[in-house]
Structure formats: C-alpha cells, structure tokens
Amino acid sequence: MPNNNLTSNQLLAKDYLEELDFIDISKSDTKDLLLMSKQFTINKSSVEIITEISHNFPLKYPKFYTTDTTMFLKYPHIEQHNHRISGHRLCLDADEDKLYYENPSDLLYDSYNRLEGFLNKIENNEFDKNEIFDEFDSYWCKTTGIVHFNKELIQKFKSFKVIDSYIIKTEDKELLFIEDEKYIEQFCKSANYNFIKNKIVYINFERELEKNIPRTYSELKSLIQKLGYLSSLQKIKKAKNILPVILFSIFIPGNKETHYAAMYFDEIKSTNVVNFINPFLSDSNSNKVFYGMPAMNISNSRLYKRGGNLMNVNVHKKRKKIAIVGCGSVGAALAHKLVKVGCNNLLLIDPETLSSDNIARHLLGMEYLEQNKAIALKRYLGKQFLDIEISAVDEYVEDVLNDLKDCDLIITALGSDANHIEEKIIRDAINKNSAPVISCWFEATACIGHGILFDSTCDSKVFNMNKLFNEIMLLDEKATSMFVKSDVGCNSNYMPYTYLNANLHLNHFANMVTKYLMDEKIKNHWVSVGEIGSLDKYLKSDLKVEDNTLIKRDF
C-alpha cells in the first residue's frame, strides 16, 4: 500500500530505487516509513532485500534488511530479526564513518553500492569465517535486559556452574547482577532499593561456537551435551529460583580475550514448571528459538578503564584510605570526583546537617535536607559503584582524631582558610604523627583556590600556619572582609562564591590528590585562578593574573 505521507526526499528515494527495480511494499502500520523490496540472486537462490527510508532521510541513512533467516549467524554484519520490518538488518555503515550528504541521490548511490559489495562478498565467499565474532554483540543481542556481572568472580569458573545472581528492583525496572552479595546489599541500602537473590547457569563454551553458533533449543542442547554438561543441567531442573538465563563465555578466534554474553529463554512459569530447564530439554520445543542477551562486565577495573584511562585503574588498585574532613560544598564535590577516578575507600567526617542555604552550591540536593552531611554523602556516593568502602562519622573531627590514624591521606576541606582544629591535624602530619594532609580552600567568592600538601618534608620548627596562609593568598585582606556575609545567629558568617569557579578549583584539587596517590612527586602548593572579575583591584601589588591562568608554585 503506497504511503501518502512521504517527504520530498522520500519521494526522490522512491523514484531512484524504482529505477533499480525496487518495488514499494510500504504498510499502513509503518506510518512515515518508505519500504522498498527487490529480489537478488545469491548463490543461485533468490533473496529478498528490503530498503527502509526514514522521513529524516538523508540525515538517517537508508537501512537494508534480508528476509532470508538462514543468512543470520552465517555471515557477519547481519543483526537479529526485526519484527517491525520482518527481516534481519544488514549493518553496512558504522556510525563513525557516516558523512553528511547535501545531495540525497549521492547517499542513495553510495548506499546501494555498499549493499551490492556486501552481497558480492557473500556470493564469492570472501568473508573470513571468524569475522562474525568481531561484532558478536551487535547481532547476538535481542532482548532489552542485560546481565551485569563481575568478571573477577566469573573467570575462576572453567566449565559449568550454578551461581548466585541478584535482581535489583529500581523505580521503573529490574536489573540483573552477578556480584558479591555484600556489595549488592550496600548499594541497595544507599539507593533504598530491594533485591531478590536467585541462581543463574553459567557455561564456558570455550571454542565450540567457532564451529556452529546455536539458534534453537535442539542446537543448544546438542552443544551442551557435546561438552558433557547435559547431566549437570538435568540435575537442577527441579531447583527453584533458577532464572531463565544462561550466561556463557567463548574464546574470540584470533584473540586471547574471553567474551561473555547470555541467552534468555522465554518460558512462562506454570504450576507444573519449576524453571526453564524442563521446557528447554523437551523434544516438543526443539525448534523453539532462544534470545540473545548482552552481558556487561562491571568489575571496577573495567569500569574505571572505560571511564578514563589506566590511571583510574591504578588509583583503584592502590586501595588507599582517604579521610575527608568537612563534607560541605568543597568536601562533598571533591569526594564525588575522587570516587569517579578510582578512590574507593573513604572516611567522611562532618557534624553538620545540610541546610537549604547550601543547596545551590552543594553536591547534594533537596532530597538530603536536614540530614547529616557525612551520612547523606555516604548514601549518595554508595549509589555510584558497587565495590566501594565508605564510612561516615557525624561528629566533630576533634572528637574522632583516632579514626584518622589508619588513613593514607587526610583532606581538610573546610572551604576557607584554616582554623585551630585544622592546624592540629596539619601539625600531626608534619610531625609524622598522622598521614599527610592536603588542605583545600578558596579565597573570596572562590575566584582563587588553594591546595596545599603538608607532610614530613615541612620543617615543623619554622612552620607558622597563619603566616603561611597570609603569604600565599593572592588577594589582600580587604577582599575577604568585603565579601563575608552574616546571617542572624552565632557563628553565622559565610562566604558566598561562584559555583563554576568552585568547580574549576575542585578539578585541580582532585588532580593533585590523584597524582599524590599515584606516588608522583608533586609541588606542595597548587593555585588555580577562576573568574577574577572586579576583584582584580584586590590582587596583591606584585601580582597580575591573566584570564584562564593556572598557577602552580612551591612555598
């Protein structure tokens, strides 16, 4: 049925394809899509190819589908069956290789040539037999669910294994995890989620899929029998809480890496069926098809590598314990950045509760109002990763100084220049009575940020904290007194500051901390300069700051 709602570019494509002997097979339920079909002869067999032209063509490239199901899993670049089109998509264009075409006809010409080239390679048997594994997940995965697994737990299993799995129920979906139970509990407690413990079957297929990739129950059963695991599967056919999923691993040909994916069995439980295994083993279901399911490695070594580089992985491997004294706008945001770069063992200390006055510049939002900052921050950070160790103390640091003794680094993040408690912590570091300290604070309106490392290299005999802080400040005292505000009440003074300025400095603080954790030799004093604006008149007489300048210097 011809589609009467086509755009001018779709009509152009229709005329172009008709000249190539395609015919219009658009359906009423395909709405704004143009579907064109043509029969090609491949290896003496007639194969239907369907072309899909979107209403966004040429911004969306033409898509090609084959209705020949025997081509799937036999040749590369052919994806799972698309029920909307009733065919398997031919993936001929990588997103990173796509160009913008000013002339839609040029795109049609190039796309059709790529299609012919692909079909010719099939005709001439030019595809490497192992090429299908290079993009395994692209065509294997069919379901929307994902198995999130920790590879470090799985890789020790060499054959067949029934392992613990967990379904975490979020507000709008259920997530499947294979991870240490203590981390599941910790994550769910932080996120206020519930979880259900189940079992899942894991099979190591080794190199067997190189010879034949199964599609049906009978093909998979034959493969499992060949590997000697069929009896193991039969033993658990009456076991409860077995998910209808098989996680499996294979060796990618020509690659030393082990790849993981999963299979989903669409078996509805009945009173007579305990799990999916009985229907799977039944001869009456031999031609039934299971669904490919993606499996994602969530081990921290993988996540940190994807989220940055090997530095993140190495920071995580150090597993150094970091205390953050002060979980206000500076400490909370810095803790978040450090967790994201691999610091997974934090001690958070702050006696205060989160006030609405701080919401605009604090990492935590309205959800955490009137909660202790350290405990609320622990909950927030606990939702970022599974394998993370965070403890929170809702007391004044002077009352819990002993808690700092087993830390590898102490960060004081009080947001402004030091007080007498911070001086005590710093002097302990200088005198080797505690771990080194990095003090992080801002000058007026957060236009300037300071990160200072205090350790045993500092001379305790000449150390004078107030003198030091006054010397390294870039603004004179007038700037501080000019911008300090006061609310009603005792100890109600505060310094307003620009969020964007603060975030700039926090990135430098995190960079400084990371380099220190990696045992790099760093300068003791880092200064970052944000938007100075009208405050340039308060710069000390011997200083001049250009826009976007980062200053690093020792003291």
Predicted feature residues:
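Compact alpha/beta protein-protein interaction domains typified by the UBC
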Residues: 25-93, 105-109
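Structured beta-strand segments within beta-sheet-rich domains
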Residues: 82-128
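Glycine-rich phosphate/adenylate-binding loop
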Residues: 141-282, 405-409, 413-555
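N-terminal charged helix/coil linker that caps or initiates catalytic domains
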Residues: 266-322
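Glycine-rich adenosine-cofactor-binding loop
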Residues: 312-353
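Glycine-rich phosphate-binding loop and adjoining beta1-alpha1-beta2 segment
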Residues: 353-385
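Rossmann-like NAD(P)-binding element
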Residues: 374, 380-392, 404-419
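Conserved SAM/SAH-binding loop
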Residues: 394-400
